[in-house]
Structures are given as C-alpha cells and as structure tokens.
Amino acid sequence: MAVARKIRTLLTVNILVFVGIVLFSVYCRLQGRSQELVRIVSGDRRVRSRHAKVGTLGDREAILQRLDHLEEVVYNQLNGLAKPIGLVEGPGGLGQGGLAATLRDDGQEAEGKYEEYGYNAQLSDRISLDRSIPDYRPRKCRQMSYAQDLPQVSVVFIFVNEALSVILRSVHSVVNHTPSQLLKEVILVDDNSDNVELKFNLDQYVNKRYPGLVKIVRNSRREGLIRARLQGWKAATAPVVGFFDAHVEFNTGWAEPALSRIREDRRRIVLPAIDNIKYSTFEVQQYANAAHGYNWGLRCMYIIPPQDWLDRGDESAPIRTPAMIGCSFVVDREYFGDIGLLDPGMEVYGGENVELGMRVWQCGGSMEVLPCSRVAHIERTRKPYNNDIDYYAKRNALRAAEVWMDDFKSHVYMAWNIPMSNPGVDFGDVSERLALRQRLKCRSFKWYLENVYPEMRVYNNTLTYGEVRNSKASAYCLDQGAEDGDRAILYPCHGMSSQLVRYSADGLLQLGPLGSTAFLPDSKCLVDDGTGRMPTLKKCEDVARPTQRLWDFTQSGPIVSRATGRCLEVEMSKDANFGLRLVVQRCSGQKWMIRNWIKHARH
C-alpha cells in the first residue's frame, strides 16, 4: 500500500509539473496574462494541503521540493504584474529579513512622500512585496501544534490614501503566511481615498494576482476607521474576522494560535502581539511582550503584563489585557455582532478600541494579547483624518464614559479638563448603547477596575478640578510649569492638562495631568514648607511633613496652607513671566476660583 501510494503521489506531481510547463509555453506564445497560471498556483496550494499527510517524512519533503519548483516557474511569470506599476515581487531585494534599507537617491521626492504618508513610501516601492521578516515568536511557540479543523478567517484591511506598495505588501504577507485552507478571503476597505493609483492599479493587480481571494469594498464617502471596519465586517463571510491596518506584515504562524484560542472560546477577542516597522527604513524591530492599557483620557498605551503572567515565566502564554491598541484584532464574527460591534456613533477613530475592551470584559467576554501570533506594524509620523482628530478622540472618550464607566466617568472629564455639565462636546445619543448594556446584563465599571485593570489610579476623593484663576489676574491660570521643574507658575489660560488642578477631600492641591496608572507618575502636590515665599511642586509621597501639602480652599475664597496659615497669592514682579509671580504670604484677601465642582459618590 505504501509503495502504491508513493507511486500515485509522484505520478500526480509529475503530471502537475508537465501541465505547468505546457501552460508556461502557451503563456510565452500568447504573451498574455494567462488565468490558467493563476489557477495552477491555486491548485498548487490545494495539492499541498491535500497531500500534507501522505507518505513518510521523506516522501513529503520530496513532494514539497517538486511543488516548490513548479510554484517558482509559475510565480516568475506572475511577478510581471508588479513591474508595470513600479513595484517589486518575489525573493531578494532591499529590506529582506526585515533589515533596514536606504536609497541613494533619497531626496526631495522622498521628503514629499514622508509628508503625504507618514513613512518612506519611496523606499517602500523598492522593497519586495514578498520580503521575509524575522520570526520573533517565543521559542516555545514554534514547537506548538494545532487542531486540523480550525475555523477560517476573513482578513479585513482598512485604508485611506495609503501607499499602494504598503497595501499590497500587507496583502502578500497575509497570503504568504496564512495556510490556504484557513484564509477564506482578504477584504480591502477603501475609505474614499483620493489617490488615483488606489483605484485602477489596485483593482487590476489584485484581480489578476489573487482572483476570487481579494475583495475591494469602496466607501462612497469618508466614514472614518470605525465605520469602515463595520463595512468590512458586513462583507466578511468566514466564521472569524481579523481587522488590521493596511500597513502591516505578518509573521509566520500568526493565524493558527489566534484561531485556536477563539475556537476554544468564541467570546475571546485575540490581539496578535505587535512588532514595529520603522517608518524611515522599514526595519522590523521586536517589541517586548506587553498588555494594552489606557489613561483616563482613554488614550491607549502599552503597559506591563499582569503580575500573574510575569510570575508564570512562560513568554508564549496569552496576556490578559484591559483594552487594545487597535491596529489588529481577531474575533468570532457572530460574537462580534452579538456584543454590538464597534460603536457606530463614534467618529473617525480614537477611543473605540478602549470602549471595546471595557464592553467585552464587562459583558462576559475576554481580551488577550497572544505572543505566538505576531504582526509588524508601521507607526506612522502622520496619520489620515488628522484634522480635528483630538476633538474626535475627546468626543468618543466621553461617549464611552457615559455608557460604560458609571460614576468613574468624572475621571474622563477631569483628564480632558472639561466640565461634566455643558462640556462643549456633542457626543451624540447614547440611548441605544445604554440599552445594549442592559440587554447584555453587563457588570459595573468598578468590577472591571478591580478584576481587569487594577493598575488604574482612582481619584474618587476629588471635590473640584479644572482651571484655577485669581481675582487679581483672571486671564491667567495656575500651571504646573516645566514638567521636570518644581515651580508652579501663572500662565495665560488655555485649558490643557498642564493647567488641570485638582482639590481633594483630603486637602491636596495637585497640578498637572492625571497619573492614571501605576506605570505613570502622578500629578505633583503644591507645597508650602515654610522656608521661603515661593510654593513648590513635589511628588506627594516625598513631602517631609504631610501638613505641608494640605490646603483649605473654598470657591471665591483664599487658598490657605494648613501647615503655615499663609495664603497662596499673586504679586506683581518685573522679573517674573507676564509680570506675575506666585507667592505664599500673609493673607491679603485675594480670591481664587476653580472651574468645576463635582459631587463624588464613595465606592
């Protein structure tokens, strides 16, 4: 039986080789782009899958060698598709192995493309669409095996005015590094790009290179990343959907661990670990394993993995994460719909990635970073949708806070230094999202902080926050001054975080941005140590005598040091910025006003 099977296998392979040579000859005579060649490549992939279990290890290696040769013959012909549009396919060339690359003629044109794309697009055009990148998976990951019946995945890329070579490298990379039986389709969602080459050239290339595999969805108007991803979800047909920025490259073996974890629990959202593609040289750099967190402004950031993961000592183990950075995530398609997708009432992008993390955890699901599944990502210096992106990030953050954060929503308003009533931001109608939370029977945000994100600092004892002005100089606000300095100053009021002042029930008067998490320094305390006329800013825990950091303050009244009885006041000085200096001295009746008072329930 084994001999007969071997004969049948080799006969099949030789027939395929013969057919490939014949088709290649026909191609040369007709000088066209034969669709038969494309079908042979697809057939070759199916043959690989069908015969993966046939014969001994030696048989399989021999078969794969013959198939590799056939694929090389066909691939060399298809490589011609990239040349007419000025791009490079196949092995070799600049940047192989994820190494840094440069161009000798990197000049004014490259500078213009930097401004347009936020990365070196001219260099990207010279790097192969099929380049290899380093395998940064932990060693244990490479020894793992997975079930044969994993679900298929639809991979969705969102782009707007991206460089064509970067988009196509993302597509090539996912096709090259995903087993054919697992990759159902690739969906490109064009969020109404202006770039002409992203129309005809892109269509023609993917239709010839990947017929039936790659679909393009085009938005008739600019929707923003959030709603563009929803369009990709609607177009997807596989049981699992992976959402990615269109400027990524996939590591070998990225799909199997992600699909395996979702197969175990469909309520689990998996985040491939992120490595970096340097925007200037396209060097692929390894990032340390990290969870994804955020500050009280709901801006995402990398954070240290949970202590239980560190104690485990297994770099291949999944990392519990409170939220996601947002450039890549994989999710069961039906489950994503069940929990409400991304909030369609949010605009452009920013905050939706944090909101999804809160919602998944509070509503019975989970989210994890998977070190065995890795994707390299370009951190661009310039991003699309740049106009008013801070406004949209603020708007989306307030929307998430109103739905999911209960009384802790005050922290988001504090972080943005805006009032809770009439904040000057219309975050839209959230009634449908509140109904979703009720329908899903979700837990409280307090539960989430205690069980998922205990690293967050809470400021429940805050009585009042915002800009603080003196009656003697009402156009100027208390300001933390230089970040690394120890002197509070008066500065023209601008409402940003350096002028965020918080007064707590304990009597602390703190200046500067919220520390948010245990990984970040907290805002400093205003201190009167009694030794001079100038108040200082110190880390609250470093103040020698606790009373030196305590103040009495009432609206439209003085600010009085509990340690010395002196008042914080303003004096005119030719030597000070804007002619105004902060001092502590005998009280003269000066009054201070702070912008926002809150009533905070104890938790």
From Swiss-Prot:
Pathway: Protein modification; protein glycosylation. GO terms for cellular component: Golgi apparatus; Golgi membrane. Substrate binds at D191, R222, R380, Y385. It catalyses: L-seryl-[protein] + UDP-N-acetyl-alpha-D-galactosamine = a 3-O-[N-acetyl-alpha-D-galactosaminyl]-L-seryl-[protein] + UDP + H(+); L-threonyl-[protein] + UDP-N-acetyl-alpha-D-galactosamine = a 3-O-[N-acetyl-alpha-D-galactosaminyl]-L-threonyl-[protein] + UDP + H(+). GO terms for biological process: O-glycan processing; protein O-linked glycosylation. Residues 318-380 are annotated as: Catalytic subdomain B. Its cofactor is Mn(2+). It holds the Pfam family Ricin_B_lectin. GO terms for molecular function: carbohydrate binding; metal ion binding; polypeptide N-acetylgalactosaminyltransferase activity. Residues 1-6 are cytoplasmic. There are two conserved domains in the glycosyltransferase region: the N-terminal domain (domain A, also called GT1 motif), which is probably involved in manganese coordination and substrate binding and the C-terminal domain (domain B, also called Gal/GalNAc-T motif), which is probably involved in catalytic reaction and UDP-Gal binding. This is Polypeptide N-acetylgalactosaminyltransferase 9.
